[in-house]
Structures are given as structure tokens and as C-alpha cells.
């Protein structure tokens, strides 16, 4: 936790205030990330349970070990049988309460160790399914073999794993090629500031300085 705080402080250019985040983004994802400072750090757990909205771009017909572009393609599958109607029907299968197995390349813990540390060493990682909720899922664009979807989901949802499962349900494969978190609770992308603008904004706030 302390290392995480130091990393955030360095990234934001702040040193002497309490700081934390209410949910990380995947390395290749962009979008809303709630940063809490000072007394607001006490609300981190509350923010973590807010529903999240994502816009995801999926490439059908190919998979990667990480389910995104972090790793290279490891297998290809046919896509000629896939139609827009088939995609729309499959997406609705994921609406509601579902069980999802997290990616091996994730921060989930296995016997006290991070899954991604084990996966990067080549160890086989077995993760248990987690119960989560997909409140909304819709097809935004369909340019086969690429599709773009919007997802509103609960805490703990891995959109990379959802891409994997959608690919399998389409009797093919899939991986993420783009991911934007567009909303956390009521905080939308258009309400946010760029990371580089944070120090200037912070100077205008009343903050509680901490002693290391």
C-alpha cells in the first residue's frame, strides 16, 4: 500500500499529502480514475463499489495470453460464421449476474502471490470464478471481425475476461484492442482532468499535509 501511495505521488507530482486511488486501470486502458487526497482517502472503499462504464474494442478471431495487446497473439480462430445478429444475441447472455474467471495476468492473489507475477514467470495460474453483475451491455459498432461495445458493470469486472468469454460464446476467440473507462459512479470522463493538470489544481485546494 505504501509503495502504491509513493507511485501515485510521484506520478502526480505531490509529496506531502495523503493520496490513494479508488481502482486502477489496466496498463493499456485509459479513462476515469478517481484519485483521493487528504481526508477523502477515507472514502476510497465507498468509491470502489461504484458501478463503472467502459467502451471496449474487441478483435474477434484471435486470442492473447493477457486477453489484450500486452501479449502477442497465441491462437487464431475462424470468424466467417459470425454475424451482427449473432453478436447481439451473445452479448445479452452476459447481462445480469454472471460468474467470471479473472485473467491470469491480473492483480488477483494466488497463495499470497499476485497472479500476474506467477503468469509472467510461466507458472500455471488457476483462479476461482467471481460473481459479478453486468447491468448493461450493448453493441455500438460492428465492423467484423472488430466490434465495439459499451458495458456498465460492478466492481471486480475484468473487461479483458469478458472479451475472452464473448469470443468463446461466438465459437471463436477475442481479445481487447482498446478500452476506455468512461464513468465511475456519477463521475464521467468529461468531468475529469488530465494527470498533468493535477498539481496546478491541487495548489488551489485546502489540503492536509502529512509528516512522513
Where do the language-model regions lie?
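Catalytic/RNA-binding core of pseudouridine synthases
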Residues: 1-5, 9-212
Amino acid at each position: 500500500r505504501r509503495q502504491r501511495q509513493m507511485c501515485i505521488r510521484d506520478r502526480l507530482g505531490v509529496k506531502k499529502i495523503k493520496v490513494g486511488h479508488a481502482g486502477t486501470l489496466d496498463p493499456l486502458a485509459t479513462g476515469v480514475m478517481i484519485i483521493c487526497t487528504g481526508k477523502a482517502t477515507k472514502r476510497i472503499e465507498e468509491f470502489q463499489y461504484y458501478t463503472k462504464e467502459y467502451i471496449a474494442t474487441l478483435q474477434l478471431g484471435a486470442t492473447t495470453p493477457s486477453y489484450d495487446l500486452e501479449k502477442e497473439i497465441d491462437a487464431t480462430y475462424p470468424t466467417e460464421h459470425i454475424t451482427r445478429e449473432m453478436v447481439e444475441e451473445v452479448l445479452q447472455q452476459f447481462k445480469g449476474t454472471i460468474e467470471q474467471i479473472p485473467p491470469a495476468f491480473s492483480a488477483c492473489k494466488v497463495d499470497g502471490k499476485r497472479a500476474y507475477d506467477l503468469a509472467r514467470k510461466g507458472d500455471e495460474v488457476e483462479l476461482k470464478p467471481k460473481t459479478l453483475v453486468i447491468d448493461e451491455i450493448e453493441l455500438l459498432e460492428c465492423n467484423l471481425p472488430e466490434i465495439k461495445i459499451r458495458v456498465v458493470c460492478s466492481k471486480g469486472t475484468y473487461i479483458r475476461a469478458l472479451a475472452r468469454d464473448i469470443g468463446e460464446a461466438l465459437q471463436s476467440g477475442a481479445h481487447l484492442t482498446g478500452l476506455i473507462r468512461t464513468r465511475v459512479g456519477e463521475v464521467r470522463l468529461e468531468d475529469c482532468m488530465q494527470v498533468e493538470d493535477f498539481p496546478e489544481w491541487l495548489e488551489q485546494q485546502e489540503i492536509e499535509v502529512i509528516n512522513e
